[in-house]
Amino acid sequence: MALSLHTVFLCKEEALNLYARSPCNERFHRSGQPPTNIIMMKIRSNNGYFNSFRLFTSYKTSSFSDSSHCKDKSQICSIDTSFEEIQRFDLKRGMTLILEKQWRQFIQLAIVLVCTFVIVPRVDAVDALKTCACLLKECRIELAKCIANPSCAANVACLQTCNNRPDETECQIKCGDLFENSVVDQFNECAVSRKKCVPRKSDVGEFPVPDRNAVVQNFNMKDFSGKWYITSGLNPTFDAFDCQLHEFHMENDKLVGNLTWRIKTLDGGFFTRSAVQTFVQDPDLPGALYNHDNEFLHYQDDWYILSSQIENKPDDYIFVYYRGRNDAWDGYGGSVIYTRSPTLPESIIPNLQKAAKSVGRDFNNFITTDNSCGPEPPLVERLEKTAEEGEKLLIKEAVEIEEEVEKEVEKVRDTEMTLFQRLLEGFKELQQDEENFVRELSKEEKEILNELQMEATEVEKLFGRALPIRKLR
């Protein structure tokens, strides 16, 4: 079987390859089958994709006894042509493949950048490489999804602003509050809980377990049923949200709480978060309620009731001190005041102050929350407020820059004054040297000097080495 190749170059680095195959094999003559010429046409472009067609030419009337049919320039009497498409190039599919490849490369680069600029500064230098290696090996998919998700990517960018701040942990938690979604949760579950790529923050003893005597000895969990507001909180990271309305009910021997609260946005708006927590009572210490066995970060919260007053009155309250732990942080904590009223009753403050002292806290440091739960401001108002705050921020930064410039000018002025003073002092020293020089001249030398009426420099030139070397000072 003869096979020849002919290439035709087209525009834009495209080429057309023609493969011509002639039926010169003797088997075709003996078989009596209709001979067929096959031409393969392959179009190749510079993007590496091909479009191939096969052209069949069948001879209906021809004599195969003549070997001239096997020549390159055969005369064809009657040709029946048909096309068979082998592979069709889909432009959309090709572009999709290219974009997918570029997107994968972008994601890989973004992962490396996240490791370099976000994760590494957040952990100790010893653990930095281990953390990045673990994420790239164990949580590559979750990290790629995070970078591709706007909220999760914004969370990563927000975390970058927390590096090396005094309130670094609190800043990181606020970032999570603002940008939390399912993608963020999946990344945290892999990096923190499942693969433990991120080191756990140790307990520093800020919120220790309270003394048993500081906890109420008798408490009925059924008294917690109904709606309660958190009207005051100790920890600004966990306790001081607006519109904290929690509704509790009993399920068998467990207390179930449906918790809702608001997260403020940067433009003055808000969005509402919610969670469900289940508590069991400590049989040996009724004032202790435990919320364990949670899937998300395996967090565990222990509540200790320091004081309570439940008489179905507007000033009913429950003073809760809590501490907790999860896969990311061991030993976080805080304290909240639950009241039936959306505002803190003044009449219960003395009781709260006494209870706060029992755990070494000052109730004056608690933060009053806003439970008015009003509607979200209109978008125009929020934009105006944001613009005003931005203007205030610019003015503040301009004032700070001006103050820094003034300080630099003062430093330069002080430097110039110091230099001038040193020059003046040096000039005085030269005058003193000159006076000492003249004073120590001998009588004969002074007479000669007076006669010559020379200056000190001229005297030095005149006498040269003849003048006695003396220590003038």
Curated annotation (Swiss-Prot):
Coiled coil: 383-463
Catalytic activity: all-trans-violaxanthin + 2 L-ascorbate = all-trans-zeaxanthin + 2 L-dehydroascorbate + 2 H2O; all-trans-violaxanthin + L-ascorbate = all-trans-antheraxanthin + L-dehydroascorbate + H2O; all-trans-antheraxanthin + L-ascorbate = all-trans-zeaxanthin + L-dehydroascorbate + H2O
CDD domains with a match to the protein in the record: lipocalin_VDE (cd19420)
PROSITE patterns, A to Z: LIPOCALIN (PS00213)
Pfam (any one): VDE
pH dependence of activity: Optimum pH is 5.0.
InterPro entries: Calycin, Lipocalin_CS, VDE, VDE_dom
EC id: 1.23.5.1
Location in or out of the cell: Plastid, Chloroplast thylakoid membrane
Description of how activity is regulated: Inhibited by DTT.
Sample GO molecular function, one term: violaxanthin de-epoxidase activity
GO BP: xanthophyll cycle
Keywords per UniProt: Chloroplast, Coiled coil, Membrane, Oxidoreductase, Plastid, Thylakoid, Transit peptide
Superkingdom in the source lineage: Eukaryota
Protein function: Part of the xanthophyll (or violaxanthin) cycle for controlling the concentration of zeaxanthin in chloroplasts. Catalyzes the two-step mono de-epoxidation reaction. Stereospecific for all-trans xanthophylls. Zeaxanthin induces the dissipation of excitation energy in the chlorophyll of the light-harvesting protein complex of photosystem II.
UniProt xrefs under PANTHER family: VIOLAXANTHIN DE-EPOXIDASE, CHLOROPLASTIC (PTHR33970:SF1), VIOLAXANTHIN DE-EPOXIDASE, CHLOROPLASTIC-RELATED (PTHR33970)
Family: Belongs to the calycin superfamily. Lipocalin family.
Note: Associates specifically at acidic pH with monogalactosyldiacylglyceride (MGDG), the major lipid of thylakoids.
Name this protein carries in UniProt: Violaxanthin de-epoxidase, chloroplastic
Organism: Lactuca sativa
Gene from which the chain derives: VDE1
